[in-house]
Amino acid sequence: MLKVAIVGKPNVGKSTLFNRIIKVNKSIVDDKPGITRDRIYANAEWLTQHFKLIDTGGLMLDEFDFKKQIELQVNYAITEADVIVFLVSYKEGINNDDHYVAKILKKHKNKKILLAVNKSETRNKDSYDDHEYLRFGFQKPYFISANHGIGIGDLLDAIVDTKLKEIKEEDTFKFCIIGRPNVGKSSLVNCILNEDRMITSNIANTTRDAIDSNFKKDNLLYTIIDTAGIRRKGKIQENVDKYAYLRVEQSISRSNLIVIVLDGSEEFNEQDEVIAGLAHKANIPSIIVVNKWDIVKEKDEKTMNKFIKTIRIKFKFLSWTPIVFLSAIENKRINTLFNEIKSIRENLNLKFNSKILTDLVFKLQMLNSPPLFNRGRIKINHVTQVDGQIPTFVLFCNNPEYLHFSYARYLENEIRKSLGLNNVPITLYFKNKTDKIRGKKNDK
């Protein structure tokens, strides 16, 4: 797939252009320079042509916090991109930072570089000011306004004009990594990808955007989504933190699996429980990762069991969730995490015959009869699986409105156990036997 990177100094509108092209507010946009620190990926389409778009942090000549890390991220993006959109601002004009970026880009002569002049909505179309931008040596400039959508079509025409061999996209399994700030989420991503994909430091919240990374392991495709650390709502004061909190919820909504990262070197707190609650609310599989296991003091053979017991008490609503102990910074026990991810992926794809399901539920009713109600006893006479993000089963019975939630929970736990679905949530729908099934059956 064609890869396109947007590069430029801070505050020229890179993230606004990124969002305009993908039609989603994926990058955090604010007037404050340096809001985008990592490189951010998204799929885009123009005139039926698909391409991968990359947003990057701003480059500056002067020294500033995270300069080396941001330059490393931008260089990664430039290296992997086929097309580079060099973005400058008509409103602010050209300065030394723009020439600094141009100097970096000129080292990549094998790349297609498109110069785009953003914030040009006030420019007179009849003006002859191209010469100022032609000095960069990147052919004619494209005058655009990312905010107003002006000139974007011409720029996209030039982007998709790049010829590449078509690569068929395969199914990918998406999982997001969530947790409070500084528990090691980005270190875990870097460990998995074997590169400094994220900017990491001891300063809380050095990752602000949700960032997608595609990779392959054991011939299976994955997309990993790293998110900003979630602070307590009372401490969310800056717009950036509010945006990041919403981005975490969006990341969860497009994931197949949630990895909840805890800091093993500190006591678990209320915010950890709030974050785990987001995973529970999403009703998709999750894994609890106890990170920084290398610096947990005075470990013995009982330490891990003590942690597990504490987690099961604090996060009792995630009783089925696997727990993994690892050290991202030392790259230890990472395979344990992937064994769980692979197992969950396989379980989500399992399909069960209706006869097997019906026989199972019949036996469960024999072992523990449904409670009585004023019209008699509820009887479940048929079960089928339908399509869903998690294993989803429809149980047909008489008077489902009288089924007590405790009996539904009994069936859910026993069905999960009997079918070997111990590490994923399942959904049960109780329908009147005269109701029609919505969704595709799995009766093979």
Curated annotation (Swiss-Prot):
List of residues binding GTP 2: 179-186, 226-230, 291-294
InterPro entries to which the protein is assigned, alphabetical: G_ENGA, GTP-bd, GTPase_Der, KH_dom-like, KH_dom-like_a/b, P-loop_NTPase, Small_GTP-bd
Residue span(s) of domain KH-like: 350-434
Keywords, in A-Z order: GTP-binding, Nucleotide-binding, Repeat, Ribosome biogenesis
UniProt-listed Gene3D superfamilies: 3.30.300.20, P-loop containing nucleotide triphosphate hydrolases
UniProt feature coiled coil, ranges: none
Entries under SUPFAM superfamilies matching the protein: P-loop containing nucleoside triphosphate hydrolases
Binding residues for GTP 1: 8-15, 55-59, 118-121
Residue ranges constituting the EngA-type G domain according to the UniProt record: 2-167, 173-349
Pfam families to which the protein is assigned, alphabetical: KH_dom-like, MMR_HSR1
GO molecular function annotation: GTP binding; ribosome binding
GO BP term, pick one: ribosome biogenesis
Family: Belongs to the TRAFAC class TrmE-Era-EngA-EngB-Septin-like GTPase superfamily. EngA (Der) GTPase family.
Role according to the record: GTPase that plays an essential role in the late steps of ribosome biogenesis.
Subunit structure: Associates with the 50S ribosomal subunit.
The protein's name: GTPase Der
Organism: Malacoplasma penetrans (strain HF-2)
Gene designation: der
